[in-house]
Amino acid sequence: MTRFGSMRRTKVAAHVMDGLGAGGSDALDALASACAGLELFHAAALVHDDLIDSSDTRRNSPTFHVGWGAGTGSVKALNDKGNQLELGAVAGLLAGNALLILSARAIDQIPAAQRAAIARLFREIQLRTIFGELQDSVLEANCADAGVDAIAEMAINKTAWYTVIAPMMFSAYCAGQGDELLGPIVDAGSSYGQGFQLLDDVIEVMGDPAVTGKSPLDDLRSGKATRLHYLVASECTAEEKGQLNQVYGCRDAGDAELDIYRALVDRHWPAVNEVLQDLFGAARARLYSAGFSERTVYDIENELNPQIQGIAPMLTKVDRGYGG
């Protein structure tokens, strides 16, 4: 399973359960099944996401469809046109579908007392994640022309709901809490989702591919509309915008273009950091108001925070905003 993620959603759920003071065997058994369903759904999303993006690697290993298709050649599509379909792509599509079925089976294992509420939320999460993936594809097709509202909505749907809101609410339901926590958690999760999506954008551009497992050239070459690009472009002088327009969306961008873009990100980091602090601050305030302790919030953020080793030193200076 670690090929498909760090299990951070399950770890977030565990911290929330601990913070709610619930840890009986029935609650933990229910949470285990709920988290299994969530992790299987996450694996399905990654397999399909790599297929959609035509990604060759994930975490420095071949993506599922690339690994499966290696050395198998191609097979003919079952139609009159004689098109060729890569066997790996077929396997990736079907494997993702199979993982979705397995995730539903895991949810079915939740005891009846908690199953209805969790299953209802799980369906909502799945639909939002799928819609968020579509929004992400549209943003990439539109290149850098999209506005910040569209970018934020994509981050909430694609990232926040199943990475933050789902594990927190699963724990709340398993602990016997009702829908009274849904509002605060959705608000906090939406802010966290935007914040960590922005951090992911920074990491992809500024990071060492050997550490991040991602190419820093992908977004640069595609001209993808990201929150990071929007913020940097908003802060650029006329001369800097000329540089930005030359390198962002350049299909054959290389190290020279990447260096220019990285320099612009570094120069305008204070504006990016201000947005991060606003988003994280709003999330923390909402969780505190719902009764979550500072320690629980700190633990949640530590699990959600993406790897920053090998990233520009500025990232280590992000103010965590905690007292003491």
Predicted regions: what is each one?
Residues 1-324:
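All-alpha prenyltransferase/terpene-synthase fold signal
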